């Protein structure tokens, strides 16, 4: 990732997490080796993104997970801005009558934090 004053400032405030504190949504090839995530888009990212030409495009990625697609789009020439929705607006569960929504929320929040850690882990390369 190229040096940038804003990025450098963010990295100063958010040091690289430990790998064991991460949950990788995407697979990556990093200088330190391969990371296997839940989804491996490495061979088919262009197809996954619909074959859209990204050079000199501006992309808003909402919910980048581990950030594989962010990197891919940047490598294709796009200017990518990633936004992570706040955890206060969780819409991933339907609150059925006997569903322990609070327990689910605690587990989900912990897992999402690990995914967010993976974004920082990968982007500190």
Q: Where are the predicted features?
A:
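Generic structural signal of hydrophobic/aromatic residues within well-ordered alpha-helices
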Residues: 7-10, 41-45, 122
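Conserved class I S-adenosyl-L-methionine
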Residues: 57-65
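Conserved alpha-helix/loop element of class I SAM-dependent methyltransferases that forms part
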Residues: 35-57
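N-terminal start-of-chain detector that recognizes signal peptides
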Residues: 30-34, 52-53, 103-106
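N-terminal, positively charged/glycine-rich alpha-helical extensions of SAM-dependent methyltransferases
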Residues: 1-29
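Class I SAM-dependent methyltransferase SAM/SAH-binding core
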Residues: 68-125
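Generic detector of short, locally flexible boundary/turn motifs and exposed helical patches
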Residues: 23-27, 44-48, 97-101
């Amino acid at each position: 990732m190229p040096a940038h004053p804003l990025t450098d400032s963010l990295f100063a405030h958010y040091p690289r997490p430990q790998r064991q504190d991460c949950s990788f949504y995407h697979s990556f090839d990093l200088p330190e080796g391969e990371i296997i995530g839940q989804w491996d888009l490495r061979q088919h990212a262009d197809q996954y993104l619909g074959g859209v030409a990204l050079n000199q495009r501006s992309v808003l990625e909402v919910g980048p997970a581990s950030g594989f697609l962010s990197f891919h789009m940047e490598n294709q020439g796009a200017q990518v801005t990633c936004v992570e929705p706040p955890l206060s607006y969780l819409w991933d569960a339907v609150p059925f009558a006997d569903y322990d929504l609070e327990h689910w929320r605690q587990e989900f929040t912990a897992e999402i934090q690990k995914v967010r850690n993976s974004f920082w882990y990968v982007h500190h390369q």
